[in-house]
């Protein structure tokens, strides 16, 4: 249950998704690291955000909030009143293409390019 996924986007940026099931339960379950323009943001378990190279910001703590409550409130509002979808159809399609490409890559042990 361990996998590393490298995504390379059309604009030249890269993303790496690591999923490891063999770590300690005492370590944060989810961690996001963003590197851009000599700045770094690290979000640990949706509770602690640290920033490096960002003038006037170093860290912030909060309760865990993955946005589910707000997402369902917005979805309910859109269903009642209409409006733009919360996630564009194109984004959903691209996410599915990337998901299927990951599975294909793991099965065939090769890089998979998405058109």
Model regions: which residues?
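A short, structure-level motif marking secondary-structure boundaries and short turns
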Residues: 16, 60-61, 85-88
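A short, polar/proline- and glycine-enriched secondary-structure boundary/capping micro-motif
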Residues: 26-31, 52-62
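Active-site loop of classical SDR/Rossmann-like NAD(P)-dependent oxidoreductases
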Residues: 62-73
């Amino acid at each position: 249950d361990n996998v590393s996924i490298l995504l390379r986007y059309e604009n030249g940026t890269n993303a790496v998704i690591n999923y490891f099931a063999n770590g300690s339960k005492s370590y944060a379950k989810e961690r996001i690291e963003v590197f851009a323009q000599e700045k770094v943001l690290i979000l640990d378990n949706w509770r602690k955000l640290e920033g490096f190279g960002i003038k006037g910001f170093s860290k912030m703590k909060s309760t865990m909030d993955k946005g589910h409550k707000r997402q369902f409130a917005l979805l309910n509002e859109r269903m009642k009143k209409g409006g733009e979808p919360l996630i564009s159809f194109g984004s959903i399609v691209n996410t599915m293409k990337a998901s299927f490409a990951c599975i294909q890559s793991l099965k065939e042990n090769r890089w998979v390019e998405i058109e």
